[in-house]
Amino acid sequence: MTDVTIKALASEIQTSVDRLIQQFADAGIRKSADDSVTAQEKQTLLTHLNREHGSAPDKLTLQRKTRSTLNIPGTGGKSKSVQIEVRKKRTFVKRDPQEAERLAAEEQAQREAEEQARREAEEAAKREAQLKAEREAAEQAKREVADKAKREAAEKDKVSNQHTDEMTKTAQAEKIRRENEAAELKRKSEEEARRKLEEEARRVAEEARRMAEENEKNWSETSDSPEDSSDYHVTTSQHARQAEDDNDREVEGGRGRSRSSKAARPAKKGNKHAESKADREEARAAVRGGKGGKHRKGSALQQGFQKPAQAVNRDVIIGETITVGELANKMAVKGSQVIKAMMKLGAMATINQVIDQETAQLVAEEMGHKVILRRENELEEAVMSDRDTGAAAEPRAPVVTIMGHVDHGKTSLLDYIRSTKVASGEAGGITQHIGAYHVETDNGMITFLDTPGHAAFTSMRARGAQATDIVVLVVAADDGVMPQTIEAIQHAKAAQVPVVVAVNKIDKPEADPDRVKNELSQYGILPEEWGGESQFVHVSAKAGTGIDDLLDAILLQAEVLELKAVRNGMASGAVIESFLDKGRGPVATVLVREGTLHKGDIVLCGFEYGRVRAMRDELGREVLEAGPSIPVEILGLSGVPAAGDEVTVVRDEKKAREVALYRQGKFREVKLARQQKSKLENMFANMTEGEVHEVNIVLKADVQGSVEAISDSLLKLSTDEVKVKIIGSGVGGITETDATLAAASNAILVGFNVRADASARKVIEAESLDLRYYSVIYNLIDEVKAAMSGMLSPELKQQIIGLAEVRDVFKSPKFGAIAGCMVTEGTIKRHNPIRVLRDNVVIYEGELESLRRFKDDVNEVRNGMECGIGVKNYNDVRVGDMIEVFEIIEIQRSID
């Protein structure tokens, strides 16, 4: 249908253009005279008009008038003509479709009710006829008894009245005749019923024989074994017995007759499923039983299940975690029953929620089942126990961790000890991840771990303290105890590791070693000369003074500790650091604790496993083995392990893979169990939270420790208004997948000591993504803070700009009360918000409506000048009031 204009449509339907435009406007469609109208808009208008004026009338009234003339004879023989008008009125009602359906349903229900009533009436008539026949039979029996008594009386008194005797004999003969007729009718009906039953029995037997012949034919086609005859006889005898039972039930009558007739209904030709399942099973059982001997009997295979009289108590095996649905399946009950039992115990759970072993045990025992607790790490324990750990323990080198505040000279001190220049290679001179080195000294070998001092690397310092024997706490003599120094002391105490204090930068003029001792004593680190257990050594990493004394102190402390380890046997250790190398794959820095790690060993490392393909020391040289307290880089793992994971050499790579996969699944279950679910108790808290802005970040770094540290630091920046969300993180360069993820989630791409490859740069350029590279963690955190600060809503502050004192009050016909004021402070500006103060109490807050000076409207009045002030919608201004003018300024907030 083509579109027409408003004018053409108006002429077509014979109405005015203005009326048609108004009708379209009422229907919600704005049109002008030259606009075109689509078919959809026409339909909308038609629907609106039908709704306004109503569609076709529901009632139709027809009126008919019939006029005729009637001649009425009048007086004097004259006829009088009378006009007669007959008016007929008939109303037709158009029913609503729902009403029509309802009436049709009512008519159908009425017809069904009438049919039901008719059937009930017929049944009542049948019952009445049967009762009437029974009553007649009873009366007949009574009459027979009475007649017998009369006959006996008549025989005793034969001579009394011959005529009476003859009448009695005639009545008796009539009664005998009626009795004979009733007996004949009863005999005929019984013969008819017996004949029908016999025909039915013959038909059932014939059907049974026919089915037996078909079964014999089927069995003969599939097998030529002598069991066919057995099948034939068993099937035939079975159906014969069935026919006999049916016949007996029909003869007995009652409900059994109707049921047996239904059961004996003939099966369709060719329907192999017409036989009952019990018959076929018994026939097959008899055939199988015929192999053993001739006299083996076939027993009917019937369902032997009976509903248990009491609850079945089961042995429920429960692992460390289990979902509510799995627990319900193990107890063979519905999940709702388990949830109900948990609610009785005071715990709310959904059917897919993971519950711990103790809760599952309580629920199962509450429901009456026996619980068997299963340790799911049996395979892991078996793999760990099947290790050759050696026997003889030998002295080993101490593992020393250098800890302290940032920029206190930890790396410089270690540089001097190693006689290499490493700090210049660190970005900004700050250690970004753990470095592990072993140093040969004149008095023996020492392994050093250099940890970062920045606040973000708390977890890395904690790992360093756990993997170490001695902590060297570096404190700058000119700076004293700082926050990370205190944190290092706490880590050392938590790991129960002895502390050797190196007071660094002793060569500076402002150095104050005694101040360091006093401050450290407040945290439980007392020098030996004060009766404590900690050695204090004054060193200068720049000048090299005191370095030998520090090494001697470390070796002395190690000698006191009597450090020993098994050198021969399968190695075990810890991951100090890990990262993903583009050419070599996952690389892990491992500190061997016991045994000897060889090239080619199969290692299990947290969620990862693999064969050691290559080993390198801290200088990048290839080595074939590493003993206790030796840090090495290993290649060949299946993935990047988490820093701090245990490294264990095992015998079987297949079992190592199984254990690693089990650990991954276990970690996932624990993570799901810890997830915060949106339950009823925190629903209102979620509802009350306002709009929260999010800063999405995709983070890539060079090593795993840096990823963890940066993620923790960024997540700690989150506030109630702005939250940091790490969409994705990983080790290695920025790939195309990372760029696509950032584009899909509107995230910032952050690279820490890594770069984007060519394909990623194309996606970043095409999507105009925000890509930022960092090499110092300070800069990264500061820029994310700045981005978050931009998302914070500004803070509104009221700043008073002027104060005026009311000296007099005038009346104005236009503005009402006008306050004649003297500006005492600042500037009074027009259209600014004001407050009216009376006795230093705010009584009104509004805005200036009029500001005049000598009858001239002005925009502002300065200090020391008089003016007239009209306050909008306020006339209760009195002499002595103060009018305070202020302005609202926005202050940009920042993340602290």
Swiss-Prot record:
Keywords: Cytoplasm, GTP-binding, Initiation factor, Nucleotide-binding, Protein biosynthesis. Gene3D superfamilies: P-loop containing nucleotide triphosphate hydrolases, Putative DNA-binding domain, N-terminal subdomain of bacterial translation initiation factor IF2, Translation factors, Translation initiation factor IF- 2, domain 3. Residues 93-307 are annotated as: Disordered. SUPFAM superfamilies: Initiation factor IF2/eIF5b, domain 3, P-loop containing nucleoside triphosphate hydrolases, Putative DNA-binding domain, Translation proteins. Residues 256-271 have a biased composition (Basic residues). GO terms for cellular component: cytosol. Coiled coil: none annotated. Residues 404-411 are annotated as: G1. Residues 429-433 are annotated as: G2. Residues 395-564 form the tr-type G domain. GO terms for molecular function: GTP binding; GTPase activity; guanosine tetraphosphate binding; translation initiation factor activity. CDD domains: IF2_eIF5B, IF2_mtIF2_II, mtIF2_IVc. InterPro entries: DNA-bd_dom_put_sf, EF-G-like_DII, EFTu-like_2, IF2_assoc_dom_bac, IF2_II, IF2_N, P-loop_NTPase, Small_GTP-bd. GTP binds at residues 404-411, 450-454, 504-507. Residues 540-542 are annotated as: G5. Residues 450-453 are annotated as: G3. NCBIfam families: IF-2, small_GTP. Belongs to the TRAFAC class translation factor GTPase superfamily. Classic translation factor GTPase family. IF-2 subfamily. This is Translation initiation factor IF-2. It comes from Klebsiella pneumoniae (strain 342). The gene is infB.
